[in-house]
């Protein structure tokens, strides 16, 4: 159990690794109950009877069952005496009026007030507040808009709303290089020529299943007319699951992919700020390599999915977000920090009369604060560099770009802030460039790519059960076995969950390489490889620790002799 906003990232990761949706939903219900019992009750024991109120408790039967299960278990553990003849489940009630108990409470309190208290004053006061009073309140509490005026917007658009360079679109002479980025909310693919020219790109919202996302992307690449593949690299959440399934040559760590994709266009970049659907990555570069890295590891308050959710609640297409936000003549000041509290702040600003475009502008304005200060913990931007590159799908939103530019230049007046020409596909481009490096480094070795027809015909099953739990250490990771039908696969007839010939098993949910195997002989091979890595790459930190506490010869006590 943790922050509800960041839990979305966990759910997306589980979907990408093949965990069934129904199991993820059940886990979310469990997390809600754990959070309430562990945090809100502060060690106290809810006494029978218990009322479950509010919309989620009323409409989600699974949440009701989670409450009944865990409260019953808690009462049993703490030896709570239940009324005679009643079981725990019968003492947990969801009334039909669960949505309206706060309203009913207001009625009860009002009925108990002395006569003459809180007498209805008519609609004139309310009308005045709607038409005039809230405008005065807004003027006192709000701030300037994202754009100071028409001239400010015109100059910004002239500098940043430059049409990105189009893909060449020509047919490649020779095998192409493909890079795919399977992100939390989107899937992207790019095609490079042997000369590393961009030939084709596609960008789509994720369907929530990595194999289906891969089928969709490769179908588009095939239809674009690139039959011969010389190298394939994957990055993003789904890379490890899909590498063997589609026959990728390499799986590239996200930081490496994004840095490579940026340095190809901006070799003198100092800082890369990548804002995606559910994560924020800040990469600080020194001499063309990543010297420091910041990730929102415990909160996703600065992500793009939050902006998308707010736009959807206002029934505004995401593509129209910036246009709507730029219409605002003023905007409220939203609090930096936790996305859950930020949502509460938005509701509070709505009560004050702020319109949709004003709140959307304010949300774009607070995003850089959350990205750099709250998530990145970077107070002094001037210390990290002078050239900042903005990328990631969220930076397709020009309102966010405007807010980022103003924030960075407010901290570093001489900063050069540039927008990646392919902000959404930067990771995929980096992966494709890594595929090109792999092909050159191997002397043109044939790619492992399985082929468009094989990927289109993929069928699979997913299993998470007691038999899939890893037993190689006390952690007991809950793994998921994803079995994919592939021609020529050997199967695993000896497994606890036998797999027939013609099927390949991909294991996800493990915390270490040992979790990728089922058989003890396979485990011995993994351990041997790990020992080989230790021998080849010494543990420098351990060497420094030993050297720091080793007594030097000069300090050693003299030996009597």
Describe every region a protein language model picked out.
Residues 1-3, 8-14, 99-102, 108-112, ...:
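Glycine-rich phosphate-binding loop plus the immediately following alpha-helix
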Residues 24-48, 155-166, 362-384, 551-555:
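Phosphate/ATP-binding catalytic cores across multiple sugar-kinase/actin-like superfamilies
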Residues 81-83, 91-133, 260-261, 307-309, ...:
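Glycine-rich phosphate-binding/hydrolytic loop that grips phosphoryl groups
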Residues 112-179, 183, 438-560:
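Flexible inter-domain linker/hinge segments
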Residues 165-199, 269-289, 330, 469-484:
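Gly/Thr-rich phosphate-binding beta-strand-loop-beta motif of the actin/hexokinase/Hsp70
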Residues 194, 202-206, 221-255, 291-292:
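Short beta-strand-loop/turn "lid" adjacent to the catalytic site in phosphate-handling enzymes
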Residues 37, 41-44, 103-107, 158-173, ...:
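Conserved phosphate-binding catalytic cores of ATP/NTP-utilizing and phosphoryl-transfer enzymes
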Residues 42-79, 95-99, 235-238, 366, ...:
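Glycine-rich phosphate-binding loops at beta-strand->alpha-helix junctions
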